[in-house]
């Protein structure tokens, strides 16, 4: 692609509005970077589908040359140069590393990184299902229609306007997409819970019961039940989710609607639930939670695992940007939002809670303790 000579000359000479040619070229590069941002996701998706992380990992400690990778992938030799170009951007993004191979002269080889380790399909905390789920065309399609959606006067989400059904209804009608989504959420849960259980140990000591609201198929409930065998754990979710699931000694599944009733417990646990809902819906859920727990003096509290969006001047650029990406994903799929501390506080006060503590120990997410 080549710019028209007159346009290129105009940019280099400035635009007549006080902007220098260098400033305009920098602005142009900034725009191009965002135009092509989607390529990072697609390149990563391609690498995972080709099993490149597995090949590099299994070849350790030796680096894998391009020719060896072509052979391992069983792709046409004619596409070697294209594979090199794919790897080049993934090395630039930090997903793979490159090194000189001494025994092969100046030939280069590829090595895995910590990020690519988390993309291994058999890794207990693999992020591959999350990657493949969130870049699935069904999930991305609503974002193509944001501008049309903003002009609509109804209360449909972009997902509903695109696919003719809400996200949850769509999953009920397309089991394979529900499975993809559940796998995506499961991988996030496994990674986070390894930290949560360590960080929550002191927060859960002394309690006798806990209910995991919207706990799905019980990944969190099982982890807590195993880590705290003296705590009675209850997983609450809709009948179609938990109706056929069986518990264990200190774990049970209960069918129900969190907007109507939450089983009594010392602690109510909400992992990535409230960000799915708008403020009015969140307040309803929080009020049901407050009804389910004892007073603060008796040890009652909520534990919320969710995002607290960084203030403009706090947190790294990358982490804040990722939080904002999450927020627009929620806008596309559901009625929810990622919230700042101020926005969380308004919800807690409106639902009748008196205090809260935020512990930012989960990377992009935080542990929020809320007290009646």
Swiss-Prot record:
Tissue: Mostly expressed in stems, and, to a lower extent, in leaves.
Upregulating conditions: Transiently induced after wounding.
Any single GO BP term: phenylpropanoid biosynthetic process
First-level EC class: transferase
Record has Cell wall biogenesis/degradation as a keyword: no
Reaction it catalyzes: (-)-pluviatolide + S-adenosyl-L-methionine = (-)-bursehernin + S-adenosyl-L-homocysteine + H(+)
Pathway: Aromatic compound metabolism; phenylpropanoid biosynthesis
Positions bound to S-adenosyl-L-homocysteine: 214, 237, 257-258, 271
Location of the active site: 275 (proton acceptor), 306, 338
Stored InterPro entries: COMT-like, O_MeTrfase_dom, Plant_O-MeTrfase_dimerisation, SAM-dependent_MTases_sf, WH-like_DNA-bd_sf, WH_DNA-bd_sf
GO molecular function: O-methyltransferase activity; protein dimerization activity; S-adenosylmethionine-dependent methyltransferase activity
PROSITE patterns given in the database record: SAM_OMT_II
Keyword list, A-Z: Methyltransferase, S-adenosyl-L-methionine, Transferase
E.C. no: 2.1.1.323
Function statement: O-methyltransferase involved in the biosynthesis of etoposide, a chemotherapeutic compound of the topoisomerase inhibitor family. Catalyzes the methylation of (-)-pluviatolide to produce (-)-bursehernin.
Quaternary structure, from the entry: Homodimer.
Family to which the UniProt record says this protein belongs: Belongs to the class I-like SAM-binding methyltransferase superfamily. Cation-independent O-methyltransferase family. COMT subfamily.
Protein's name in the database: Pluviatolide O-methyltransferase
Origin species: Sinopodophyllum hexandrum (Himalayan may apple)
Gene from which the chain derives: OMT3
């Amino acid at each position: 692609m080549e710019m028209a000579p007159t346009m290129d000359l105009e940019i280099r000479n400035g635009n007549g509005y006080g902007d220098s040619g260098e400033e305009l070229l920098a602005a142009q590069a900034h725009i191009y970077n965002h135009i092509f941002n989607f390529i990072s996701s697609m390149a990563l998706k391609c690498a995972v589908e080709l099993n490149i992380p597995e090949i590099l990992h299994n070849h350790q400690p030796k680096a894998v040359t391009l020719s060896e990778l072509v052979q391992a992938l069983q792709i046409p030799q004619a596409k070697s140069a294209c594979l090199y170009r794919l790897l080049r951007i993934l090395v630039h993004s930090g997903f793979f590393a490159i090194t000189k191979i001494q025994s092969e002269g100046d030939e280069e080889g590829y090595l895995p990184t910590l990020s690519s380790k988390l993309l291994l399909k058999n890794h207990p905390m693999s992020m591959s299902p999350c990657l493949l789920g969130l870049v699935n065309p069904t999930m991305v399609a609503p974002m193509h229609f944001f501008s049309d959606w903003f002009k609509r006067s109804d209360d449909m989400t972009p997902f509903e306007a695109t696919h003719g059904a809400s996200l949850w209804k769509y999953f009920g009608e397309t089991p394979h997409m529900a499975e993809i989504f559940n796998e995506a959420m499961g991988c996030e849960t496994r990674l986070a819970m390894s930290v949560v259980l360590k960080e929550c140990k002191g927060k859960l000591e002394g309690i006798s019961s806990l209910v995991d609201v919207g706990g799905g198929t019980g990944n969190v409930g099982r982890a807590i039940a195993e880590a705290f065998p003296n705590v009675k754990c209850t997983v609450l979710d809709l009948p179609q989710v938990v109706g056929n699931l069986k518990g264990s000694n200190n774990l049970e599944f209960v069918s129900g609607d969190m907007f109507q009733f939450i089983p009594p417990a010392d602690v109510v646990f909400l992992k990535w639930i409230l960000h799915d809902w708008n403020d009015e819906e969140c307040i309803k859920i929080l009020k049901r939670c407050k009804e389910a727990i004892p007073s603060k003096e008796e040890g009652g509290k909520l534990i919320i695992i969710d995002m607290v969006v960084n203030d403009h001047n706090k947190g790294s650029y990358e982490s804040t940007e990722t939080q904002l990406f999450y927020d627009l994903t929620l806008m596309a799929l559901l009625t929810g939002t990622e919230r700042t501390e101020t926005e969380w506080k308004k919800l807690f006060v409106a639902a009748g809670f008196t205090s809260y503590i935020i512990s930012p120990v989960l990377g992009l997410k935080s542990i929020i303790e809320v007290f009646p």
